[in-house]
């Protein structure tokens, strides 16, 4: 099953995205979500199918959410996922002996 999807980015949270079916637009997005998300900014349109790979989302879950609730919300990554941790020896370099 292929779906044409519009993807919107949040002006409030970096790396937060809202996926909706292009034909529906934002009609099925709950009103309570928009104050949290902010005014959606259209990023791009995409054809989704079960074979397609997404960088940070499970395509099966995205397609299920689009069918069942009319949208999919992609949350920003957790801090641990994008912060590079320094080796212990570098962290202690300036410690007093």
Swiss-Prot record:
<protein>
    <recommendedName>
        <fullName>YcgL domain-containing protein Pput_1298</fullName>
    </recommendedName>
</protein>
<dbReference type="Pfam" id="PF05166">
    <property type="entry name" value="YcgL"/>
</dbReference>
<dbReference type="InterPro" id="IPR038068">
    <property type="entry name" value="YcgL-like_sf"/>
</dbReference>
<dbReference type="InterPro" id="IPR027354">
    <property type="entry name" value="YcgL_dom"/>
</dbReference>
<feature type="domain" description="YcgL">
    <location>
        <begin position="3"/>
        <end position="87"/>
    </location>
</feature>
